[in-house]
Amino acid sequence: QLVAHPVWATQAMFELNRAQALNALYAEQDRASTSAMAATVNAWFERDAELTEMYHSIKGGKWNRMMSQPHIGYVYWNNPPANIPPVVQTKALAQPAVADMGVSVEGSRAYWPATGGLSLPEFTLYGEATRTFTVYNRQGKAFNWSAKASQPWIILGKNSGELLADTPVAVSIDWSQLEAGHHEGTINVKGTGWGGANIKVTAHKPELTARPVSGDFIEADGYVAMNASEAKVKSTPNGSWHKVAVHGRTGQAMSAALPPYSSLTHQQAPALEFPVFFTSTGEFPLTLQLSPSLPFDEATGIKVAVTLDGEHVATLALPSQKDKQAWAQGVMDNVKELTTTLPVTKAGRHRLAVKALTPGAVLQRVIVDTGNLKPSYLGPPQRRAP
């Protein structure tokens, strides 16, 4: 009633929506596994109904009908008349069975043979250690496949086999074989069809004069992400920052503790300091994710300053509470974003700081886009040097 049902019901809805998204992707990529994923969607839909009935039977029906409100199939604010089975797609297979290879790569909807060239996301020195491509069947008969890399520094988790269904293959880089710079290679995958699929592999090894120190937030895969709760607090006589547990998108946030109605310069303000290691230089978009908050003093608002290596970069303020639409959106997202530009003139270690100029700021995350930040609702994972 209080623990199991919320966990199980959340799992059912997550798995249902995930399977529905994969079903749509598999159909677009012409995978034979499209129908199997449709069956998975329907199984989780049935699981949700089963959980509802279980809840209604607790204590001889003590809470009967409490979970009866429809919650699957929303298309606008009001609930549908009943839980609507999700729309799924299936794929008919040839009879008698034949084999027909398809190949896809992570991070892309494209697939071979419909798309001539495929590319894995770029490997970076401190980024994801492995990328994945998938060899799959577009029909119902098993076939043999093989994969070969054009460069010795491209490492394949497996290079051949027999498959009937989807087979993911991990790809990694032997960085010890690479000099500093940008490198390219290909992976040729053969199975059925003429010529096979060619997958482009790129790797960037920056030329660095120093290495990150343990605990540094590292630029990887085109971004730097930093959880505020892991910053170093630099208190001043004028105030400090305190951790707020079980709050925000990362589970913890940092709240500025200043006297009411105070208004400080960035030299006077308490700071959250982040040791950051950049592998590139440029003018990078920086985003602060703060919790929606109302100011103690509408005249001064909620303001923070951003500094890099002690130099002032920008002063940012949360929008006025009079902007009701912006406030409503912030509450729904549980975050308000403030943006500025961060000038990084040299690669290596830097000290990024966020300083509370007025009371009320609750910082969740800091994200710097160094050129390849992908769109997402919750943002990318952070990386720290071991």
Pin down the residues of each PLM region.
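Catalytic domains of carbohydrate-active enzymes that cleave complex glycans
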Residues: 1-141, 223-234, 238-245, 254-263, ...
